Amino acid sequence: MPTTQRFEGPSDLHLHSAHSDGTQPPAEVMASAHRHGVRTAALTDHDTTSGWAEAAEAAASLAMTFIPGMELSARHEWRSVHVLAYLVDPDDPGLRAMTERIRSSRLDRARIMADRIARDYDLVWDDILAQTTDGATVGRPHIADALVARGLVRDRAEAFSGILSPGGDYYVALYAPDPVTAVGLVAGAGGVPVIAHPAGRAGLLPATLMDRMLHAGLAGFELGHRENREPGLQTLRDLCRERDLIVTGSSDYHGLGKPNQPGEHTTADAMVARIIDRATGSAPVYP
C-alpha cells in the first residue's frame, strides 16, 4: 500500500493551538479534533512549529495521523495573506530566519499597541501576558482576549473591528514578507504551500499576483473555509480545475469558545495524498 494511503479521513488541515493564537495546548487540539470525528489533522500555528512534538504524540495516542504544518504570515499592500505550509523542514535556514523575524516583529508590535491602548483604556502589559501560554508569541489576538477579560469589549470580533482595527489609532502593522517570497520559502523548505481562506471578505488577490505565486511553487487553495465567499470562490474553483491545483477544506479551529469547529470543512483523501506525495521537507506521523 502506498505511504500516502496509510492515513484515514476525515482530514482537517488547519488547526491552531496556544502556541500561536489558539486557546488550547496542542494535545487538547488533537483531542478536540478527534471528538469531532477528525482522523487526520494538521497543526498550523502562525509562524511557528513549536507545537509539533506535543501534537504528534497526542495524535498517535488517539490513532490519528498528524500532518506537521504552519501558517506563514505574508502581506500584499494593505492586506494580510496567510500561506499554509505543510510538511516543511522546520530547520530550513531561510524559513527559520523568516519566522524568527516575523515573531520578533509581532512582539514589538504588541508592545507598541499595548502602550497606545493604555493611554485611553485600563489595560496593562500583564493583562495581555495573562492571555498567553509559555512559548507563545504575544500577538493581536492576545490583546483582544485581554480587552475581553477586562470587560472593555464583548469578544474578539468587537476588538478586531474597533480598538485593534487596521488604520485605527492603536494599530501597528506587522512585518511580513510578500506572498511570492513566502510561497518560495515554503517550497524551498520542501513544503507544500496552500493559500488559506483566499476568497474571504477582502476579496481575491490580483490574478497577476496569483500567477506569480504559482510560478514560485504555490500548490493550491483552501476553498473549504467558512470565510470564503462567492463569486470569488467560483473563480478559484475554475482556476484549480484548469491548473490541476490542490484543493483543501479546513476548520481554522482556534479552540474552545470560538465559532469554528474541527471538521466543519475537510480535505478529500486524494488531496491529502497529493500533499504528502509532493512534500520533501518532513513526513506525516502515522499512528
Regions picked out by a protein language model, each given a short descriptive name:
Residues M1-R79, L164-S165, V183-G184, A189-G203, ...:
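An N-terminally biased module of ancient metal coordination in phosphate/nucleic-acid-related enzymes
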Residues E230-P231, S250-P287:
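Catalytic core of soluble alpha/beta enzymes
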Residues P2, A58-T208, A270-S282, Y286:
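Extended substrate/RNA-proximal surfaces in nucleic-acid metabolism proteins
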